[in-house]
A protein has these predicted regions:
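PLP-dependent class I/II
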Residues: 1-150
């Protein structure tokens, strides 16, 4: 259910109107399929969690190995990682454009995510990428960056 937000907030009643405004901009209305899937996941327990975690860890470890030597922020969990494009004298948006144009790699610049210095970071999501598609991504990234410096 990557990207689908299902949950609740427990807070003092005085904070709820402000939280509702924040959630409106940060959380997409839950799709019916997500609500159904969340209900089933809650009832089924944690049986598949270890298997899913192992798959995501394998993808993470492969992409980290592929991008070795680049300014990557190693994730402790989740299904994405950040590259510090600023240390390569680029913005995240510039690096995103170069990777898309020269290597057919789609990655998200972090300038709109509200983090401090977000414009210097680029996000790679590997959640649903099969290992076969991740293999070789390091060479593709390096070639695209080299083209950008020519």
């Amino acid at each position: 259910m990557i990207g689908w937000r299902i949950g609740w907030i427990v807070a003092p009643a005085t904070l709820i109107p402000d939280l509702a405004l924040v959630c409106m901009g940060n959380v997409v209305v839950p799709a019916g399929i997500g609500q159904e899937a969340a209900a089933i996941a809650l009832e089924a327990g944690d049986g598949d969690v270890a298997q899913a975690t192992a798959i995501w860890e394998a993808r993470r470890d492969l992409i980290l190995a592929e991008l070795d030597g680049l300014p990557v922020m190693r994730p402790s969990g989740g299904w994405s990682l950040l590259i510090d494009a600023g240390s390569l004298n680029m913005t995240g948006a510039e690096m995103s454009a170069a990777l898309f144009r020269d290597a057919a790699i789609a990655a998200t610049p972090m300038d709109g995510w509200g983090i401090v210095n977000g414009a210097q970071f680029l996000r790679f999501v590997f959640a649903n990428e099969p290992v076969e598609r991740l293999r070789g991504i390091g060479d593709r990234v390096r070639r695209a960056l080299a083209r950008g410096r020519e």
